[in-house]
A protein has these predicted regions:
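Glycine-aromatic micro-motifs
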Residues: 1-124
Length: 124
């Protein structure tokens, strides 16, 4: 699982606080565009910018919990779509799940050019 926003360590939905516990694999970058949606980010898997995140090995049970948090349901096309993409971590290419934001949700939203949610400017 590649996480880039509120699921990162120290953020509101820190994946390391969820059960069953995930195993940290490493830091990674993917190609994409990160948008500031207010309380959380969204990433579109397009563009030549990089998005910074963390990779975790997760169980199917934790995947189901994460799907609930991100409101991903197989029957519906909602805010996030679950994708599987190749991610390079410490010289190994892994197939990782990532939650991609739907196009209609980023219209008019600000791009975070450095692609790092943890470095965003605090809300005023």
């Amino acid at each position: 699982m590649f996480v880039y926003g509120t699921l990162r360590r120290g953020e509101d939905n820190d994946i390391t606080r969820l059960l069953p516990p995930p195993r940290f694999v490493g830091l990674a970058q993917i190609l994409g565009t990160m948008y500031d949606l207010g309380a959380y980010p969204g990433v579109r898997l397009v563009g030549r910018s990089t998005v910074l995140g963390e990779v975790y090995e997760i169980s199917p049970a934790l995947e189901a919990v994460l799907d609930e948090i991100e409101e991903v349901y197989p029957q519906e096309r909602d805010e996030y779509v679950k994708r599987v993409i190749p991610v390079s971590v410490q010289g190994c290419v892994l197939s990782c799940i990532v939650y991609e934001i739907g196009l209609r949700y980023v219209h008019g939203k600000a791009v975070l050019p450095d692609g790092d949610w943890t470095r965003r400017s605090p809300a005023l």
